[in-house]
């Protein structure tokens, strides 16, 4: 065995979970992505999706994707920088910039590539990137590629953020990069306070709206719009794989920043462009988001109903007010076991365990879609109560 394979063979955590019968990953879905899915011939309720508006199976979204394939084919066979820019891309960029309140935007092939390519290239060796300790992995990978000084602050802790800003040289660029809605715990960044500190220390702000878009703000414009700080935030990032029912991502900002990124963001320049189908699907989902605000209203009705149900049950969920609801278990193996038992009861949820979070912070991520019904939610709450009670997590 070569040294590389010998080293990698020592990683056996998945095999141990499989042997214990609690391995929860790569469950093969055999149906469309809706509130009910088929997995290994078993119908289960989906409470693990990021499709907050439930648009992945919407007829208009699918029709837009099919029409784009008929006109443009299945791919662009090149990067946006060269032969991969379609009129579809340009049109969507203009619409997204207007939607989030910025001058211009760039569409990337994935949301991960946005953060990777933007965070890594905006600041130089003498500059600073300041980030929340619970930022998404794509933000972390982005600043790892940067030559700037990286300063981490405690999650949503404004005193900690200010201490890090005080370490920075006043005349150097300081970029604060944060999730608008944090993807694991579902809590919201303290944007008004962050904006105030950014003004005090002459720092710039980039907000990842992956989980805020389609959920918060006017017609789902996101966390920045929700707090009324769009003009104070320098860059707004979004993804298509959640509320926009597709695959891809974008960054929106002023024209000067977007011009720089178009010519310097390596994950944009050296990646094949987003497919016609994915681009058109995202555009159609944006149309629906604007024309059917009742979807967001129903999503929030479900969210409040679920939060009340979990709190009345005695679940530990923290101070959460979004459709991403963390059910804290605080034990890796028990989290895996409960996910398995809930699946057997017909409920699909996602485990969040170390190293994604600290071992003492493991949780089950319960997420809602606008297409869920109260009846489906009642069934899930009852099943969760039964399983949690059997493990002494609730009374």
Positions of predicted regions on the chain:
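N-terminal "arm"/small-domain region of PLP-dependent enzymes with the aminotransferase-like
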Residues: 6-74, 203
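PLP-dependent enzyme catalytic core of the Aspartate aminotransferase-like
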Residues: 59, 63-67, 71, 94, ...
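Conserved PLP-anchoring active-site segment centered on the Schiff-base-forming lysine
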Residues: 118-137
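Active-site C-terminal subdomain of aminotransferase-like
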Residues: 201-204, 211, 216-321
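Conserved PLP-binding catalytic core of the aspartate aminotransferase-like
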Residues: 297-306, 311-346, 356, 360-361, ...
């Amino acid at each position: 065995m070569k040294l590389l394979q010998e080293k990698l063979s020592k990683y056996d955590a998945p095999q141990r979970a499989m042997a214990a019968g609690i391995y929860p990953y790569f469950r093969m879905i055999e149906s469309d992505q809706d509130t009910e899915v088929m997995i290994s011939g078993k119908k289960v309720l989906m409470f693990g999706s990021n499709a907050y508006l439930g648009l992945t199976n919407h007829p208009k979204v699918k029709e837009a994707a099919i029409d784009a394939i008929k006109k443009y084919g299945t791919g662009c066979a090149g990067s946006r920088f060269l032969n991969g820019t379609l009129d579809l891309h340009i049109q969507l960029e203009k619409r997204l910039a207007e939607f989030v309140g910025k001058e211009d935007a760039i569409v990337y092939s994935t949301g991960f590539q946005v953060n990777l390519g933007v965070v890594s290239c905006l600041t130089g060796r003498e500059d600073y990137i300041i980030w929340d300790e619970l930022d998404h992995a794509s933000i972390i990978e982005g600043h790892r590629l940067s030559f700037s000084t990286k300063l981490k602050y405690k999650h949503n802790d404004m005193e900690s953020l200010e201490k890090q800003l005080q370490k920075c040289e006043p005349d150097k660029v300081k970029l604060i990069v944060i999730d608008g809605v944090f993807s694991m715990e579902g809590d919201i960044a303290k944007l008004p306070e962050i904006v105030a500190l950014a003004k005090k220390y002459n720092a710039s702000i980039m907000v990842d709206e992956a989980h805020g878009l389609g959920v918060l703000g006017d017609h789902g414009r996101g966390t920045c719009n929700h707090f009324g700080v769009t003009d104070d935030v320098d860059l707004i990032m979004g993804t298509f794989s959640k509320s926009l029912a597709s695959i891809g991502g974008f960054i929106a900002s002023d024209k000067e920043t977007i011009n720089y990124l178009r010519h310097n963001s390596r994950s944009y320049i050296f990646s094949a462009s987003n497919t016609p189908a994915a681009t058109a699907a995202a555009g159609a989902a944006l149309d629906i988001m604007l024309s059917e605000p009742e979807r967001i209203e129903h999503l929030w009705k479900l969210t409040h109903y679920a939060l009340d149900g979990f709190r009345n049950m005695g679940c530990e969920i923290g101070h959460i007010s979004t459709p991403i609801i963390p059910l804290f278990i605080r034990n890796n193996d028990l989290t895996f076991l409960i996910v398995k038992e809930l699946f057997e009861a017909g409920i699909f949820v996602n485990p969040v365990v170390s190293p994604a979070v600290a071992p003492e912070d493991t949780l089950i991520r319960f997420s809602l879609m606008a297409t869920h019904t109260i009846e489906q939610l009642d069934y899930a709450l009852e099943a969760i109560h039964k399983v949690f009670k059997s493990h002494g997590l609730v009374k």
